[in-house]
Amino acid sequence: MTDEADADPQPFAVPPAPGAPAANKPARKPRRTVPRTSEFRIAEQPGFVLHSYPYRETSLVIDVLTRDHGRIALVAKGAKRPHSALRGVLQTFQPLSLSWSGKSELRTLTGAEWVGGMLPLAGDALLCGFYANELLVKFCAREDPHPPLFQHYLVTLTRLAHGEPPVQVLRSFERVLLRETGYAMTLKRTVARRAVEPGKLYVFDPERGVRDADSDVPPHWPVIAGQTLLDMEEDDYHRAQTVAQSKTLMRFLLNTYLGGTPLATRQILIDLQNL
């Protein structure tokens, strides 16, 4: 690291474990800055590895999600060498402090440190984490930062690591992802600006939003109960109907917005866990 840029004093706000007592709230929120050494050198940026693949003989290209710079591609030189310090650091689902340089689409990683503070994912939670990563790669354009989405991804990993129900965690993440990347996800009001009623039936127009389920809607649009939409708005998935219909709705929307491009991890979840 260089001394020309001050490090962010608390780059990750890791959520507490479920049931843990809340910490005292500070009187004033500290001002956050983006450390950088020059126009094309970024220092100590909070980030996560989403995906990596081999590059030349000894290096890797890592696709990372960063808090203030969005999704970027970095060359990790020498990371494939047996004794490289980067081999154990550049892991998915672990908070990192990343530094890089360059101005092309493919930048050069100059530093990576493990921040810690998060439990590893395993089992179903690990599959869900890979699914979330694939969605981020598909929906997030390069260098298009979404700090709220970055924070929600951190929350999602924390919830999965602590054993919260994957169905609820994934539906919440999917909704935030669509909202932050430009897709309207208001579920409590219709396109006609009327409040959604629990006892009525609706459809979700991918281009406009919630509509009444009348005879002129395309037959492949799933019909959803108003109660389901209201439950999803509140992240309440205790009703079996809400669990089933929310899964159908989100599959429909994700498939539509991706132009029919299949998600590899989604099929695994369908086959193994029905998530």
Curated annotation (Swiss-Prot):
Keywords assigned: DNA damage, DNA recombination, DNA repair
Database matches in InterPro entries: ARFGAP/RecO (IPR037278), DNA_rep/recomb_RecO_N (IPR022572), NA-bd_OB-fold (IPR012340), RecO (IPR003717), RecO_C (IPR042242)
Cellular component, GO annotation: bacterial nucleoid
Disulfide bonds: none
Family according to the record: Belongs to the RecO family.
Function comment: Involved in DNA repair and RecF pathway recombination.
Protein name: DNA repair protein RecO
High-level lineage: Bacteria, Pseudomonadati, Pseudomonadota, Betaproteobacteria, Burkholderiales
Name of the gene this protein is made from: recO
